Amino acid sequence: MKLLKPGLLFAPILLAASFNIYAHGAVTPQSIDTSELPQLGEEWIDENPYRNETGETLKNIIETGASAYNQNCARCHGLEGISGGIAPDLRFLTPDFDGDEWFGYRVQNGAVRNGAVYMPKMTEHLSQEALWSIKTWLESISEDI
């Protein structure tokens, strides 16, 4: 009987924690206002079209990307781009075609293992402008690591 009491005390904590783990993959992507960004069209562009922007345009892209990341990516990939170990640390994506190719593949195809969706196909929820603004923001903070 003495062993049962501590177990009863921790049962509600374990139950609450299990709901948080289950909810991890059940995040509904949030739409992002990209009306102030250069428009890219419907066809996916293979290389970050915002990489060489400057001035106020670049500032808007980075601000939009930071907001889009925090609303749609941070839960798995970590606040401010710093992964807590659940999903890859995106600050290590290279600011070149190889990094863009991996990013593009993942946002277009998501991540599914053994039938479990770890990441949705983000192109079904966010515009190309929003996604490339996230990559541009990640490139802007990758210099800090």
Feature-to-residue mapping (PLM):
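Bacterial N-terminal signal peptides that target proteins for export
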Residues: M1-L9
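Gly/Gly-Pro-rich "capping" loops immediately C-terminal to redox-active cysteine motifs
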Residues: T64, G78-Q108
